[in-house]
Amino acid sequence: MYDFNLVLLLLQQMCVFLVIAWLMSKTPLFIPLMQVTVRLPHKFLCYIVFSIFCIMGTWFGLHIDDSIANTRAIGAVMGGLLGGPVVGGLVGLTGGLHRYSMGGMTALSCMISTIVEGLLGGLVHSILIRRGRTDKVFNPITAGAVTFVAEMVQMLIILAIARPYEDAVRLVSNIAAPMMVTNTVGAALFMRILLDKRAMFEKYTSAFSATALKVAASTEGILRQGFNEVNSMKVAQVLYQELDIGAVAITDREKLLAFTGIGDDHHLPGKPISSTYTLKAIETGEVVYADGNEVPYRCSLHPQCKLGSTLVIPLRGENQRVMGTIKLYEAKNRLFSSINRTLGEGIAQLLSAQILAGQYERQKAMLTQSEIKLLHAQVNPHFLFNALNTIKAVIRRDSEQASQLVQYLSTFFRKNLKRPSEFVTLADEIEHVNAYLQIEKARFQSRLQVNIAIPQELSQQQLPAFTLQPIVENAIKHGTSQLLDTGRVAISARREGQHLMLEIEDNAGLYQPVTNASGLGMNLVDKRLRERFGDDYGISVACEPDSYTRITLRLPWRDEA
């Protein structure tokens, strides 16, 4: 009966510890205990927490004869099991020294046994980690079993060290069973609380990550196409559906670009910004949060608006300049979730990166267009000079041929300067090249032969404008024009799987890699193809000196619309 009463008293003490553990689980202090880590701050926190439990287990223990029935083993074993041998040993030493300071027949034996209990927990920790069984560390059965063995070891140490021996035997017979039961159950329940908190934390973390990934996938590349009303509305609708919040708005520096959710009847896209929260975020570049309680929120557009809180996050572009804001709202009857707040700030960074990438891409495209215009400026005067001289020479002997050459020259410049779009058909590109070649053939006469072999089924394939002409011009200007014999240029096309292959071959074999302006045309074509389609595409060169130069252009096959 005495043992049963002692069990009840120790269980009461254990319940106090479990309540404290449960309260701790609601604080950030509990988070480091939920994972196996080698970080020093986490291990130090583990040492502090379980040392306190260890000391409390002794302090609130029950005095029996010249000893103390206690739940100290819970702190020592859990410290070792979760923190490892070093933490377990230090927790045991701290708890043991505290017990030794209280004196009594078992002071020394209890100090030693507490250190052993901490080391035993640490030993099990090391074995499980080494075997890759981290899940077993957080198993309540493991915690209970290790504590049960630790208590058995403690009783053996008391019998071995405490004197008089008869008193030690009597003490062990009275406290062994109650302490084994309560400490075992207490350690298992403590681990259960920890495991439940860990499962909940992982659930929220996985849900958070899944939402973040889904939002990232759904909004990928939208704002790269331009920071405007259409694209902003697409992003706002995705966020509204995925975040389960009251409303979402996106603004630039002056007006509302998009709004969806509660209050969309008066928050209309195109309206100038009137919210002080938005203006403050744009002016300071900082996140503005009005929770509706500590920081009151009031809609500036409608006195009866049902929105009760808002989070305004700046969107940044080049040089960290604020380009606009993203605003998340909650209704008056709902709290603004801290998860949505954190997620919102992360999404704002993602969208800012898209805006910045879009700005860079547009700048890159403008630079490429400038290079193309530069190439036109280089080619046109030189070619025009030669063409006019050729026409002048032809007009004296064959006015009809001269008329055709004028027509070819007109076609060349029309195609060269007034391309309707960035992409043209292969047939259009060949027409452009042919106009150039007809003038060059009139200039070189029998010294230049041209063969164009383009299958009819490839004629509607799309490719970037001004792709072939610079390559063909290089073949003549730096190749066949240098020959004393007849120069030959062959242009062909074929399909290879999902690729369109274009070849320009001359019989000069005079190709030399160049990095100066003389090679600007071909280098620019190669650069455009790689930037547009990737490094798997572009120009490759094969040259057999004094025999041939073959330029191969690799483009993606584009199915006809």
UniProtKB/Swiss-Prot annotation:
Cite the SMART domains for this sequence. Answer: GAF (SM00065)
EC number(s) per entry: 2.7.13.3
EC category? transferase
Q: Which CDD domains match?
A: HATPase_YehU-like
- List the stretches on the Cytoplasmic face of the membrane: 1-3, 65-72, 130-140, 192-561
Its keywords, alphabetically, are: ATP-binding, Cell inner membrane, Cell membrane, Kinase, Membrane, Nucleotide-binding, Phosphoprotein, Transferase, Transmembrane, Transmembrane helix, Two-component regulatory system
Modification after translation: Autophosphorylated.
Q: Membrane-crossing residues?
A: 4-24, 44-64, 73-93, 109-129, 141-161, 171-191
Q: How does the record say this protein sits in the membrane?
A: Multi-pass membrane protein
- Where does it mainly reside? membrane
An example of a Pfam family matching this protein is GAF_2
Periplasmic topological intervals:
25-43, 94-108, 162-170
The region annotated as signal peptide is none
Which chemical reaction does it catalyze? Answer: ATP + protein L-histidine = ADP + protein N-phospho-L-histidine
List the GO terms this entry assigns under cellular component, sorted alphabetically.
plasma membrane
Q: Where in the cell is the protein located?
A: Cell inner membrane
Outline the extent of the Histidine kinase domain: 354-559
Listed under GO biological process in this entry are: cell wall organization; response to nutrient levels; signal transduction
What's an example of a GO molecular-function annotation for this chain? Answer: monocarboxylic acid binding
What is reported when this gene is inactivated? Deletion of btsSR has no obvious phenotypic effect under the conditions tested.
Function, as annotated, reads: Member of the two-component regulatory system BtsS/BtsR, which is part of a nutrient-sensing regulatory network composed of BtsS/BtsR, the low-affinity pyruvate signaling system YpdA/YpdB and their respective target proteins, BtsT and YhjX. Responds to depletion of nutrients, specifically serine, and the concomitant presence of extracellular pyruvate. BtsS is a high-affinity receptor for extracellular pyruvate that activates BtsR by phosphorylation. Activation of the BtsS/BtsR signaling cascade also suppresses YpdA/YpdB-mediated yhjX induction.
Question: Quaternary arrangement and interactors, per the entry?
Answer: Interacts with BtsT and YhjX.
Matches recorded under PANTHER family: SENSOR HISTIDINE KINASE BTSS, SENSOR HISTIDINE KINASE YPDA
Name it.
Sensor histidine kinase BtsS
Species of provenance: Escherichia coli (strain K12)
